[in-house]
């Protein structure tokens, strides 16, 4: 028996009543959710995430999903006999790897998520950064051991044209965005889903960015588990970034970009927890780590 089934009818009513302030706070607001990690591998977590997105839409929140596909891309590369390599937390993307990335993100991962959400109603529509000029990318390098390092067809989002996403939101749909994007010359690049989610959240005026991870939140001194922090401001995070584990850097860079770009708060949450997004949005306790633009000077901490 699951915990929800063990609740009495009165308990369930209290849960709904307690959520009312948060339902009011986020009604008609855009929440960008970066979907990745274990939440997109485990079948139960996939279904729970899809149900969460349908729930948000049903109660008047406007979710926008930006997804990665790292495990699926790695599996397909292995199946095709192609070598996969990471540098500085980013996948090295040759033209051959880019073909696989494009195929897997939009043709496999995105389609599956759209189908799971649409099991709850005709809500989700899949698009990519190539569609309607949503994203324009610029090729990036990463710093590895203090040296700038080429990682191939990997880009940063430098321009966002939000019209297509806003049109879908206005039509009551849930945009599901695959993170591939052309540069100014039309050359398609692999965009890290964390950084793409941050750029999109900034570009469409989101109320919140939520990034799913495979850890409880941000550890300021990993692997010391007592260093898990529930909140951090942009200045402190910027100082901490050079000392973070490589896998967390893109996620925390994304949160930093979002809040510096006008998004009120960004959160990294544990995607291994079923319904983690609902826990973050609709409970006073929240979950994971919240990033704010600056230290609250008035004692008020954003939700």
UniProtKB/Swiss-Prot annotation:
Top-level EC class = transferase
So what does this one do?
A: Catalyzes the ATP-dependent phosphorylation of N-acetyl-L-glutamate.
Q: What is this protein called in UniProt?
A: Acetylglutamate kinase
* Pathway in which the depicted protein is active: Amino-acid biosynthesis; L-arginine biosynthesis; N(2)-acetyl-L-ornithine from L-glutamate: step 2/4
Does this entry carry the keyword ATP-binding? Answer: yes
Q: Please indicate which superkingdom the organism of origin belongs to.
A: Bacteria
Tell me the protein family, please. Answer: Belongs to the acetylglutamate kinase family. ArgB subfamily.
Q: Which UniProt keywords are listed? A: Amino-acid biosynthesis, Arginine biosynthesis, ATP-binding, Cytoplasm, Kinase, Nucleotide-binding, Transferase
EC code(s) of this entry: 2.7.2.8
Q: Which residues bind substrate?
A: 69-70, 91, 190
Compartment list: Cytoplasm
Q: Where is it predominantly found?
A: cytoplasm
**GO MF annotations in UniProt:** acetylglutamate kinase activity; ATP binding
Cite the position(s) of the site with description Transition state stabilizer.
Answer: 34, 251
Q: Which InterPro entries match?
A: AceGlu_kinase-like_sf, AcgluKinase_fam, ArgB, Asp/Glu/Uridylate_kinase, Glu/AcGlu_kinase, NAGK-C
Q: Which reaction does it catalyse?
A: N-acetyl-L-glutamate + ATP = N-acetyl-L-glutamyl 5-phosphate + ADP
Please verify whether the record's keywords include Transport: no
Q: Name one GO cellular component term.
A: cytoplasm
Q: Which GO terms describe its biological process?
A: arginine biosynthetic process via ornithine; L-arginine biosynthetic process
Query: Gene3D superfamilies recorded for this chain?
Result: Acetylglutamate kinase-like
């Amino acid at each position: 028996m699951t915990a929800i089934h063990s609740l009495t009818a009165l308990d369930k009513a209290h849960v709904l009543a307690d959520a009312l302030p948060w339902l009011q706070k986020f009604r008609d607001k855009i929440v960008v959710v970066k979907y990745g990690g274990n939440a997109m591998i485990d079948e139960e977590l996939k279904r729970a995430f899809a149900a969460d997105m349908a729930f948000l839409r049903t109660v008047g929140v406007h979710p926008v999903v930006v997804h990665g596909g790292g495990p699926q891309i790695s599996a397909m590369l292995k199946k095709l006999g192609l070598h996969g390599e990471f540098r500085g937390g980013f996948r090295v993307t040759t033209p051959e790897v880019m073909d696989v990335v494009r195929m897997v993100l939009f043709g496999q991962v995105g389609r599956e998520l759209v189908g799971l959400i649409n099991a709850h109603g005709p809500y989700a529509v899949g698009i990519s950064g190539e569609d309607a000029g949503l994203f324009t990318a610029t090729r990036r390098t990463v710093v590895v051991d203090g040296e700038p390092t080429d990682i191939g067809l990997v880009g940063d989002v430098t321009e966002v044209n939000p019209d297509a996403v806003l049109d879908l939101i206005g039509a009551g749909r849930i945009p599901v965005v695959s993170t591939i994007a052309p540069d100014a010359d039309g050359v398609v690049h692999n965009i890290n889903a964390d950084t793409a989610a941050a750029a999109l959240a900034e570009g469409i005026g989101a109320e919140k960015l939520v990034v799913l991870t495979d850890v409880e939140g941000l550890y300021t001194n990993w692997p010391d588990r007592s260093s898990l922090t529930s909140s951090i401001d942009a200045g402190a995070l910027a100082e901490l970034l050079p000392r973070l584990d490589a896998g967390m850097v893109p996620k925390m860079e994304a949160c930093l970009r979002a809040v510096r770009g006008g998004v009120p708060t960004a959160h990294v949450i544990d995607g291994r927890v079923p319904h983690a997004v609902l826990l973050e949005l609709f409970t006073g306790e929240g979950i994971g780590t919240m990033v704010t633009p600056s230290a609250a000077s008035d004692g008020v901490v954003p939700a």
